[in-house]
Amino acid sequence: MLSIVGIFAILMTAPRFANTLSPVPAFAVNVIAILLLMILGCHNVIMYNHSTFVLGYLLLLGYDVTGASYIKRVEGLAAGMILCMIIFYKNQKNRPYRRTFFDLFREFDLHSARGRWYLKLTLIVSSAMLFMNLLGLPRAMWAGIACMSVCLPFTNDCVARSGSRWQFNIVGCAIFIVLYLVLPESMYPYIGMIGGIGVGYSAGYPWQTAFNTFGALSIACLLYTSPSPRD
């Protein structure tokens, strides 16, 4: 239960705080927040919980809100936290536990494969966003998400996924260009949605990567107001 509270507390506060800082202090906040998320939620590495918790953090970081919208975001996260706690208690209340909350921190060891993976993912994701911010490029979270998706607990898996990622990024770009040329301009805003549907129906990572490029390229077109290739 304490781990759930800790995870949601980080999601409520750290992304908003990091967005108020310059790139280097924000990097420090991201390192601390992501490492804590890994320790609290990713002890069982084969569950790939980082793809939920760290991804959630990066999305909250990238889509920043303030004022009344931030209050509503916190309220929504609080409701989600309570719901998760209720479900967790209902399903796990009779299960014996041999570890306490503080054992999660005691077992953090850089000599273990799990501990090294925690630190590796944390530094790679945070550094990618730092470089994007220092270069003044928008949407730094996308660099973090891309790095997170290939930084897996097992090295062999990282190599295989990295190879398929760049190949299917090219495939996704090619399909996007075809859609951009074929569809009427009024349909351009929906290309990202088409990609989202494609991701949902893709069972494997390669095609998920291909369809994910639709959203990224759609945002790029809006950011840089690229003229239509027909012009």
Predicted regions and their residues:
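Transmembrane helical segments that form the transport core of multi-pass membrane transport proteins
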Residues: S126-L179
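Conserved small/polar residues in nucleotide/adenosyl-binding loops
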Residues: Y224-D231
